[in-house]
Amino acid sequence: MLPEAVALAHLNGDLHYHDLDYHPYQPMTNCCLIDFKTMFKLGFKIGNAEVDSPKSIQTATAQMAQIIANVASSQYGGCSADRIDEVLAPYAQLNYEKHLKLAEDWIPDTTQHHDFATARTKKDIYDAMQSLEYEINTLYTSQGQTPFTTLGFGLGTSWIEREIQRAILKVRLGGIGKEQRTAIFPKLVFSLKRGVNLAPKDPNYDIKELAVRCATKRMYPDVLMYDKLVELTGSFKAPMGCRSFLQGWWDEHGQEINAGRMNLGVVTLNLPRIALESQTLNEFWQQLEGKLEIARQALCYRIERVKEAKPFNAPILYQHGAFGRKLSRDGKVDDLFRDKRATISLGYIGLYEVATRFFGPDWETNQEAKAFTVDIVKKLYQHTQDWGNQYGYHFSVYATPSESLTDRFCRLDLERFGSVPDITDKGYYMNSFHYDVRKKPTPFEKIDFEAAYPPYSSGGFIHYCEYPNMVQNPKALEAVWDFAYDRVGYLGTNTPIDKCFECGYEGDFNPTERGFECPYCKNRNPETCDVVKRTCGYLGNPQARPMVAGRHKEIVARQKHLTIRIKSSDKDQNPAADKED
């Protein structure tokens, strides 16, 4: 079904046409920001059921779970709920009003009415958010997997919005089940904003402190830097899925629209392949132009195929409000895509390997090499801008997560070029613009290094820093968040949170050829341990769902970017804590 040049390039490993198990066989979209606000306000339909506006926060979160399940079954990428604290607050307000009326009817002392209603509402909020977390982790889509879900929150300042934020974090801190395992979904994305929660004087600073504590224990939430994200993408919004960002967009009435928009798919270039085929920088640039032309064909084909969908193919998306507008049964789905309302993504992988080919493996401090890699992303950006103006869709540059592609591209190039030091011999390619995981820059050095790329890769990006166990030192993590605020738009925390339920060890499990094992008792049974690693933008359980060999090698190679000496008082909590992380 693919154009011949595109199919050949995919098979050869020059590029990767993502999600071939769904597209182009079906005209499906990738990821989206679901328009929960409008669906809740106006009501919606799922199957044969007409669903009215919720009358409580418990009903709202139950409806949210059903919408997520239906949306995830109608597309192949992640689905996100943006500003969930603000979206759910009106329905928690209904809880408060109900409890206040109950207090007025039954409690003679009027001074107790507000306190009674507030306490009951807080309990309702916690229960609702806990139910949502359990619902998402026990749902299965028609594809047979848990929906890849992201919740964005953190900007609301009313007492109800603050309580929703607090409940989301407390539920995550509490864990799942009797063993209190770390929940993989939903991905939590906490918004930092100057004047709201960034500094101790800000009204929501206490929520930020709770978010930091949650990240030290559960890795999530990742954090969005409000001002920087607006600078990079043109407006503020949560990512679709793990890292795909919509660009600022205003409708014909001048209204900014984020919820209800979507991405139409990804095609990723194998940049190390181009470098390995080139003897000089000039040859690299010439080869890149040829590969970009094939990528353009692939992306245009994705668009044309998705446009063939009919609204009745995915009613929840096109007819019942998830995509922000309600089309007729036979309407044109392109009305929701064109005029740059939707994005289509040109991905890339392996800037580290490209520069290594021409400047050696330690090029990160070489300004000429760094400028060369930035120029590559600029070149991709220039082409996507030209394509967007030509075709009327928002072509964006996307720092591909490469959960399995890191293995596939490297494996194909190893077969073609042999073992090339620091390129194919590693068994994996570095994600997008990321610093070599084998090196040990400080978090501040890594953030400063990577900050140059997202201005040209704003269609999708994330930065990570690797830490030792930070539970006893949350202020160190907060210092990194604060440093990053004016430098990058989106930051994740990677810290050891593995648990062994046989011996009680908590920390970093040792990697082996058969997965990960407890360093103290050698346990590797997924039933009696909880191993959580950052596989790409999402967390993963590699014991329960093993990753590809290349990603496993990349995770094993990761070095900590911060060193903290464990105090003797902490060693008693951990039988294996007699070392420096």
Predicted features, each with a name:
Residues L271, R341-S345, K533-C536, A544:
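Generic secondary-structure boundary/loop-capping signal
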